[in-house]
């Protein structure tokens, strides 16, 4: 990767037993270990569903307690990441996968609540296609914290064969002079 001028970003979702909303101390331990491993391979960031996992759904908006627990866990994780020279990203995912964080704006609000300069928003066009009012607006909303994007079609298939408006996305990225990472995430 280095020879090709590419950067390494590791991505994960927390296992159920350490979802930050329910077990912040477990999440902190898990994320610290993951950050140590990311640093060991020379990654620049750890990102993904670092606040929870796929299947964490209550059918209700997140509670104050859940958000406080997530904030506590990510404050500690961001502090550890900083000691390693790493960035920590937050990927909002759709409501069918979690009730905690579904939009880019919610990720911005969480990052601003935490106040860690080494945290960033990680958008995913698959999830944006489900949750956002428009891809361009989501990109504009997150612009001050946006550093990484998963490019994925609406059906996780071949780009251009689904309903994602790629032109809208790339026009918005040009409008904010996006300099972050783009990763293709396709299940073909």
Q: Where are the predicted features?
A:
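Active-site-adjacent beta->alpha loops and helix N-cap segments on the catalytic face
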Residues: 1-2, 163
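Conserved radical SAM core fold
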Residues: 14-19, 52-56, 152-156
């Amino acid at each position: 990767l280095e020879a090709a001028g590419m950067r390494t970003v590791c991505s994960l979702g927390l296992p159920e037993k350490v979802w930050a909303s329910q077990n912040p101390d477990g999440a902190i331990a898990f994320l610290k270990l993951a950050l140590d491993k990311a640093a060991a391979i020379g990654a620049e960031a750890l990102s993904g569903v670092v606040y929870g996992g796929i299947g964490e759904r209550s059918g209700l908006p997140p509670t104050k307690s859940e958000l406080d627990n997530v904030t506590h866990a990510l404050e500690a994780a961001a502090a550890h990441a900083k000691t390693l020279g790493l960035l920590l990203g937050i990927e909002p995912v759709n409501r069918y996968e979690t009730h905690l964080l579904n939009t880019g704006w919610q990720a911005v609000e969480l990052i601003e609540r935490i106040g860690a300069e080494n945290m960033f928003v990680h958008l995913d066009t698959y999830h944006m296609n489900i949750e956002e009012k428009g891809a361009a607006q989501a990109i504009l909303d997150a612009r001050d914290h946006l550093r990484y994007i998963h490019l994925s079609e609406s059906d996780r298939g071949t780009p251009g064969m689904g309903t994602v408006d790629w032109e809208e996305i790339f026009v918005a990225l040009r409008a904010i002079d996006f300099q972050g990472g783009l990763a293709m995430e396709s299940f073909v």
